[in-house]
From Swiss-Prot:
Signal peptide as annotated in the record: 1-27
Annotated GO CC locations: external side of plasma membrane
PANTHER family the UniProt entry points to: BUTYROPHILIN, MYELIN-OLIGODENDROCYTE GLYCOPROTEIN
Cystine pairs: 51-125
Role description: Minor component of the myelin sheath. May be involved in completion and/or maintenance of the myelin sheath and in cell-cell communication. Mediates homophilic cell-cell adhesion.
Gene Ontology BP annotations: cell adhesion; regulation of cytokine production; T cell receptor signaling pathway
Extracellular topology ranges: 28-152, 230-245
Protein name: Myelin-oligodendrocyte glycoprotein
Organism of derivation: Callithrix jacchus
Length: 245
């Protein structure tokens, strides 16, 4: 009787194995694994947030989704084999896509197009199989390719082309001016070689008189002749008035 009432060692082992099986079936069917480091994306580009279950198994019939706090805003939801676009938050409608090529192995990726600064922060991925659900958190870091450029640098970048153009025009002008001066200097030297040095030492008033007299001489002679002719005709006209017959 004593031997029958005392539990045997194999009975204990069977009981422990049964507990482990039940706990593995209901307490830990799978776990969700996300990226261990923040996902980086540039403004305007696309970001991909991977998520998977372990151990891997077919997740086609599961409910898969991403949401954000606060208020558990739905970023993307997959249920009954279809994307539930109507349940998305307004800011993500038309911008997300669930990549399901490896969903048979329990691997999916959420693609967010046209990334914006408000997209930066935490996302939560979840897998739900009937009443069992597991989830994993991940971070998205959004960067601007010009984040390092201060307003002063932007102003400098805008002014530099104009300044460069002005400097270029100024250098071209100085070059042309120097070339023109050299040409004029050469022409003046040629004139010095052409003219007699003795002529160049003549006083200026003599040169002026030498140039003006040939021009004004005929003009003065013409004026004198005109006055003489005018007086002669006037005298004849007066004489005819005195002796009409």
């Amino acid at each position: 009787m004593a031997s029958l009432s005392k539990p045997s060692l194999p009975s204990y082992l069977c009981f422990l194995l049964l507990l482990l099986h039940v706990s593995s079936s209901y307490g830990g069917q799978f776990r969700v694994i996300g990226p261990s480091h923040p996902i980086q994306a540039l403004v305007g580009d696309a970001a991909e947030l991977p998520c998977r279950i372990s151990p891997g198994k077919n997740a086609t019939g599961m409910e898969v989704g991403w949401y954000r706090s606060p208020f558990s805003r739905v970023v993307h939801l997959y249920r009954n084999g279809k994307d539930q676009d109507g349940e998305q938050a307004p800011e993500y409608r038309g911008r997300t896509e669930l990549l399901k090529d490896d969903i048979g192995e329990g691997k999916v990726t959420l693609k967010i197009r046209n990334v914006r600064f408000p997209d930066e922060g935490g996302f939560t991925c979840f897998f739900r199989d009937h009443s069992y659900q597991e989830e994993a958190a991940m971070q998205l870091k959004v960067e601007d390719p010009f984040y390092w450029v201060s307003p002063g640098v932007l102003v400098l970048l805008a002014v530099l082309p104009v300044l460069f153009l002005q400097i270029t025009v100024g250098l071209v002008f100085l070059y042309l001016q120097h070339r023109l001066r050299g040409k004029l200097r050469a022409e003046i030297e040629n004139l010095h070689r052409t003219f007699d040095p003795h002529f160049l030492r003549v006083p200026c008033w003599k040169i002026t008189l030498f140039v003006i007299v040939p021009v004004l001489g005929p003009l003065v002679a013409l004026i004198i002749c005109y006055n003489w002719l005018h007086r002669r005709l006037a005298g004849q006209f007066l004489e005819e008035l005195r002796n009409p017959f």
